[in-house]
Amino acid sequence: MKPLGRRSFLAAVSATVSARALGRTPTAGTLRLRLPLYFGGIDPHSADDPLSALFAPSIADPLFALDANGKPYPALASALPERTATGSRITLRPELLSARGKLLSAADVVFSLKRTQGSGGAAVLGAFRPPLADGKDRLSLSVPEASPEALARALANPLTAIVPRGFSPTTPDGTGAFKATLGSSSLTLTRNESAARGAAFLDRIELSRASDLADALRAFETGQVDVGWLGNGLYRPKASALPLDGPIFGWIVLRTGLDAKAWGAPGIAAQLTAGLPGSALTRFGIRPLAGAGDGVRWGGGPTSLLVNEDAPYAVELARALESLLSSNGNEVRTTPIPRTTWLEARRARRYGLLLDFVRAANGDVTQSAQALLSAVDPALARRPPKNLNSVLDATRTLTLGIVGEVRVAGARSPEFEGLDTWQLGSVWLNPERR
């Protein structure tokens, strides 16, 4: 099956609208959002940042992508991987420019793959040897001992997106449909005219940081933004709004640490999250996973639930979890701390309980399980359990339990077409629906 590019997608959609609209080229418009998330940077290789999970695929592309049948096809690569006597060979498309004007070569691919192998990409690249640039061809690289088929599938994962050498999350760059500019509490995406797979249809996407969920919903109700994050207004629904029902982009997870002592043993976290009532988490856009089984309440004595103080959504959710996890004499208390302190506590496992996020890169059960395993220990992702029926099967022996999956949801202004797919480069403004 031949995949649809962004321009072909538009042509297909345009065929369904009025004849008067067929001649219009909808390359205009600004989409506004307010989100209660941490605005510390955009990193395509991050597996623990919701903002990056939502918007990094709009600024950076992987070497391959998957068609509607789940088969890899070339995106930034000129062809599918070639089998060689020592492994697999990949050649980059020529003349690829990043949004900030950097010409890409195989050296940038090697940099990107090594970078993500030490970060979020460890989940899918842990089984592969480090890539090697071809000294005679600036566009080619090899991956020793790699199967071309397995390599192409792994390198279609958004966590393996290609970025220029010297990449920084605070000045993000890539070949995607948008160019990103980060502010202290804002993110602006503008059309990238040199995008490798076609520039965005919208002129720009403007994001600002909400102080909490209520702030995000109020902004939609009063017309300040075009997306109601996780709902349609704070006090009353917006009459003209349409439902927004997009893809899963990750899981909220609960970690048990060394300070939990016996309650920090593998499998306890999964039991704690299994007992959480889904109805109490609905307003957070969280859907518990089916088949979690019977749960337990916290029994390890009074403890803190650590959370990044710069992530309003996570802080609000943690406070809602307090009463759901606590039992008499075993009170759980939300403790917001600076992100650097939170990261160090997570690394050393010096906590009783800790609230975290793990990015879901696609719907493949094995790769999803690898992401969760890697969040505990990247070495575990190299040997995921076989015959998985659910990602829950991968967490029953971990120090991490799934609170629930989080998806793009809420409400949207009707003039923005294609938002439900969350392929932001393909979203376009339909003036007839204003």
Language model feature labels by segment:
Residues R34-A85, T91, K114, D173-G174:
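N-terminal lobe/hinge region of extracytoplasmic solute-binding protein
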Residues L37-L54, L76-A77, K102, E149-T160, ...:
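A structural "hinge/loop" feature
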Residues F55, A79-G121, S140, A262-G264:
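Aromatic- and charge-enriched surface segment that lines or borders ligand/interaction sites
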Residues E82-A85, G121-G166:
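Surface-exposed binding/hinge segments that line
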Residues S105-S112, S140, R204, T222, ...:
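Alpha-helical secondary-structure segments
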Residues S147, A152-E206, S211-D215:
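Gly/Pro-rich hinge or "lid" segments in bacterial periplasmic/extracellular proteins
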Residues T181-T190, E206-D259:
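Extracellular/periplasmic solute-recognition and catalytic clefts
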Residues S184, T273-V296, P312-E322, R346-R434:
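Detector for C-terminal structural segments
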